[in-house]
Amino acid sequence: MIGTCYLHTVIDDYSRVAYVEAHDDETKETATQVLRNAVAWFAERGVTVQRVLSDNGSCYKSHLWHQTCTDLGITPKKTRPYRPQTNGKIERFHRTLADGWAYARCYTSEAERRGELDGWLHYYNHHRPHTACGNQPPFSRLINVPGQYI
């Protein structure tokens, strides 16, 4: 039986490089830890997070979320309620993710499906052509990755 999975997604607005974690919940504690992990992951790739645009879920309205953003030097912004178009990049990515990973084949378990996520994300970020990137993969737009020119 396939279980419930909450995908916490962070996408760089310029490059479209995606960071995703699959969790069993969408609590404020989980959301803030994902944000911390994503900020560190992007920093390792030469990207400094300055702003974060989130929907209006309760975890993103919490004091903990705002305090975490302050601690990380990030300005939190919210989408307009009931207007998913405000966060169109994430919405479109989730459709691509659903088609290319979540429902691309029959998985025998949620654990098996989650186990395939990192491989699919690598493909998406490093190999899959993206129209917003001139039919290059998102990672091709990151030009200051530490160690890239050594």
Describe each model-derived feature in a short phrase.
Residues 8-10, 89-96:
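A structural motif
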Residues 51-56, 70-89, 105-108:
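RNase H-like polynucleotidyl transferase catalytic core
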Residues 26, 44-62, 80-82, 134-139:
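Acidic/histidine-rich, metal-coordinating catalytic segments
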Residues 7, 31, 53, 61, ...:
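Hydrophobic (often cysteine-bearing) scaffold residues that line and stabilize catalytic clefts
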